[in-house]
Structures are given as structure tokens and as C-alpha cells.
A protein has these predicted regions:
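Active-site and donor-binding regions of nucleotide-sugar-utilizing enzymes
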Residues: 1-138
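Conserved catalytic-core segment of nucleotide-activated headgroup transferases in glycan assembly
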Residues: 1, 5, 115, 125-186
């Protein structure tokens, strides 16, 4: 989508990020970032905007994961509630100004409706581009070989992906212990 839009003179697109530089990339620390967001007709985000940024166009939230834990209003979040001023009110006020929420499947819609209730928010279970790409390419042997080579995987062993979810107050007991026996198997 983004490559197409860069070459389409009718769509002016900007990316607020420190990950890349160039004519369409603006650092979040740049003075113009706030104005670009607040004057855009469509804002696509994958997290929360700072409290002082108020977009006036349509806001599309690209949720960043599958909810395998309780979210926002369904979670206790004791650390945030105790240590961040007006945490829930500020976070909720950001959510009620979003128009669309992209999630990975119809099965998770009910969890988002419960955690982030809103009369305005339209939840779209259309998947995540990076996950959809891998699912659609699962039989692509050329891509598979390139990934295996790039990650320097041992092809004589099965692959184990361990990707724990983000938590605000992670402790050592939250992390699955990986034994030498397990590591040697994969």
C-alpha cells in the first residue's frame, strides 16, 4: 500500500518514525510531527498518541498482537493505575477518538469490545499485514530457505518460537525457563 501511495500524486503520505529517514519520514521529536498528525485526513497508528496530540481526521489503530492476556478495562494494571496520573481516563479518552481498530481475527473481536468499549469504534477483523504475508507465503519454499539462511537455523532440528507478550511489570517468574535439554532439541 505504501509503495503505491508514494507514487500516487493524489495521496500525500508521511511516516512518523525514528526508524527511517527520507522525504516522507518525520521524527516524533520533530516540531512538525504534531501538526502533520493533527491536520491529516487519515492517521494510522500502532500504539498510543501522546496526550497533547489530537488528530482531526479518521484514526485507524493497527493493534499489534493477539490478546492472550486481559486488556485495558478488563485488566487490573495495578502498576499503571498506581503510578501513572489518571492512567485509565487518559488512555480511554484516546480510544474514544479512534474510528477503526484492525485486529487479527473474528475470534478476538469480543475481547476488544469488552476491553475498549466505544459506540464509535468499528472493529475490523482483517488480520495483520506482516502475519498475513507469512501465512500466505507458508508454502513458498524460496522464502522459507531465505529465512532459514538469514536466521542461520539448524535444518536438522525443528524450530521453536518463544515470543512472550509485553507486560509492564515483567518479573523473572513470568519468563518460561529454557533448559539446556530443550535448547538442544530445537
Amino acid at each position: 500500500m505504501f509503495k503505491r501511495d508514494w507514487h500516487n500524486a493524489t495521496v500525500e503520505s508521511y511516516f512518523i518514525t525514528d526508524d527511517r529517514t527520507g522525504p516522507h519520514f518525520i521524527s516524533p521529536n520533530d516540531e512538525s510531527a504534531k501538526e502533520v498528525i493533527e491536520t491529516a485526513s487519515v492517521v494510522i497508528i500502532e500504539s498510543y498518541l501522546p496526550d497533547d496530540v489530537r488528530p482531526n481526521g479518521k484514526v485507524i489503530q493497527l493493534w499489534h498482537g493477539t490478546p492472550i492476556k486481559r486488556l485495558f478495562l478488563d485488566s487490573k494494571e495495578p502498576h499503571q493505575n498506581l503510578n501513572i496520573y489518571n492512567y485509565r481516563a487518559r488512555k480511554y479518552n484516546k480510544w474514544v477518538h479512534q474510528d477503526y481498530l484492525v485486529v487479527d481475527s473474528t475470534e478476538v473481536v469480543k475481547y476488544f469490545e469488552s476491553a475498549f468499549p466505544s459506540h464509535k469504534l468499528d472493529i475490523l477483523p482483517i488480520g495483520y499485514p506482516r502475519v498475513n504475508y507469512l501465512l500466505n507465503k507458508s508454502q513458498d519454499l524460496t522464502l522459507r530457505k531465505r529465512i532459514i539462511k538469514g536466521l542461520q537455523l539448524d535444518t536438522s532440528k525443528p524450530v521453536l518460537l518463544y515470543a512472550p507478550t509485553w507486560k509492564s511489570n515483567t518479573s523473572e517468574e513470568d519468563i518460561l525457563p529454557l533448559s539446556d535439554k530443550l535448547l538442544n532439541k530445537y
